[in-house]
Amino acid sequence: MNTAPEERIPLFSLDRRKSNILRGVAILLVLLGHTGIVRMGGAGGVALFLILSGYGLNCSSESKGLEGYWLRRIKTVWLPYFFVGVLDVFLLKPRGAAAVLCTLTGLDLGLIADKTMWYISYIFFWYLAYYVIARLFGGFPAQKQRIFIMAGLLLACVPCIVLSRGFWHIGSGSKAYFLCFPLGVAMSVCREIRAPRMLRTAFWAAALLGCAAYLCLPLLGVRDLTYLTAMTMAGAAIAVLQLIPVGGVIRSALLCVGEYAYPLYLFEGLFLLRWTDWVTAMPAKWMADLAFFAASAAAAVLYWKLYRALEKRLSA
């Protein structure tokens, strides 16, 4: 008797909605990590942001090409940062022209006023690496081009680690994230792989169990590695989303948070400096945490609405 072939579905699924949900998870990890609620949550959130950036950039470049590449990066990443950088200059008062310049441009060099914003120059390093490699191998067939881009980005990890010794300030932990952006690009390249439903479920279940086991090592007194922990937290979030449909109130909340993930990231460092004072001044730490979350969220929503309105007016 003939049996129908087993249905094969994409091994990895990450549409715009799921990406937004993961952005929501990433920024929540950052906020909870920076306030000491989730151990190494900040590292896990940054790793997840970088993986999503690599994934999204490669998908975008494959569909749109490299035309307008830098304009898109400036409009979506650097320009929103610049206006907040101006605010940082006035509020944080960095000393010296070099510190002001680093703050406005997003460079680190140990001089940037808001130390959490080392991420801006870090992500632009990867944008540059991707652009150069894609240009070099742009004339090759699509499949070979993908392989060369992947190999080139893995080689770019070397200068990334070297630059971490001085280009980004010591506390950034930039060495911990050297594989995250290339990993996101690799996931984008592999997104068309299809597998039987049972095999797909088994793959992601094994991935989730492996991540959970590693994250539990500190409970057993085993010292973990920062870069592995960051990527493991990000991997666990991705695996959960592949296995469990997120719906209802949780989905709506994460989508909402994900929509404002970038402005939240831009402002949380600014309010984090105030948070330390609030912890001392308020009767309980949870009150300071709540004030920090509320202030960051209010500033992010207001700023993003103003920026979007300005962007729409300039595009008209």
Q: Where on the chain are the PLM-derived regions?
A:
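Histidine-centered divalent metal-coordination motifs
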Residues: 34, 265-268
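Membrane-cytosol interface segments of multi-pass membrane proteins
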Residues: 1-157, 248, 260-261, 280-316
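Transmembrane helices and adjacent periplasmic/lumenal helix-loop junctions
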Residues: 124, 267-270
